[in-house]
Amino acid sequence: MNDAINHTACETLFTQARTHNGWLDKPVSDAQLQAVWDLMKMGPTSANCSPARIVFVRSAEGKEKLRPTLSSGNLQKTMQAPVTAIVAWDSAFYDRLPTLFPHGDARSWFTSSPQLAEETAFRNSSLQAAYLIFACRARGLDTGPMSGFDREKVDAAFFADNGWKSNLLVNIGYGDPGKLYGRLPRLSFDEACLLA
């Protein structure tokens, strides 16, 4: 049995962490992004399928490429963020399964059912996006996840050559605490959970 993480770690990951809308002018290095990936990749996925693919958009050119895909409410904060991660999924994730899941012929589960492959890729890349958020927080970075963008435009701009499909965007950097909104309420256990 694992030991519980301490209260401070729980605060860092959950109770004191916030979704940021404004960013300090402080860069995020390639080494930091690799450290985030090396942490998030350890989170579980179905049959270790690991379908998430990430483009870390950080250059001025990359941000301008992203600009026309953004909803108006997400434009300013995304252009200001040091990094915007496009979390996508690879529909052909199963080609990596002989390496990632060598216990059996898991690849055939998905090549024989395109619908299962698509559902698995979307579900598990969403799960990995959550791991990305918590890995950023664990590494001292703030995040601002968003779904307000035009997926077709993002896919055309960034994934025309590889067929990946965008799932969500996550701004990454050092959040400006002066631009935080008040914390919104959450549902109680009794409002959201059942015991069966």
From Swiss-Prot:
The UniProt entry's coiled-coil ranges are: none
Q: Does the keyword NADP apply?
A: yes
The biological process GO terms on file are:
nitrogen utilization; uracil catabolic process
Q: Which gene encodes it?
A: rutE
The uppermost taxa in this organism's lineage are: Bacteria, Pseudomonadati, Pseudomonadota, Gammaproteobacteria, Enterobacterales
SUPFAM superfamilies named among the record's database cross-references: FMN-dependent nitroreductase-like
A single MF term (Gene Ontology):
3-hydroxypropionate dehydrogenase (NADP+) activity
Q: Which InterPro entries does this chain map to? A: Nitroreductase (IPR029479), Nitroreductase-like (IPR000415), Nitroreductase_HadB/RutE (IPR050461), RutE-like (IPR023936)
What family does this belong to? Belongs to the nitroreductase family. HadB/RutE subfamily.
What is this enzyme's catalytic activity, as reactions? 3-hydroxypropanoate + NADP(+) = 3-oxopropanoate + NADPH + H(+)
What keywords were assigned to this record?
Flavoprotein, FMN, NAD, NADP, Oxidoreductase
Know the name of this protein? Probable malonic semialdehyde reductase RutE
Specify the enzyme's EC class, one word: oxidoreductase
Listed Gene3D superfamilies = NADH Oxidase
- EC numbers listed for it are 1.1.1.298
User: What is the documented function of this protein?
Assistant: May reduce toxic product malonic semialdehyde to 3-hydroxypropionic acid, which is excreted.
Essential cofactor(s): FMN
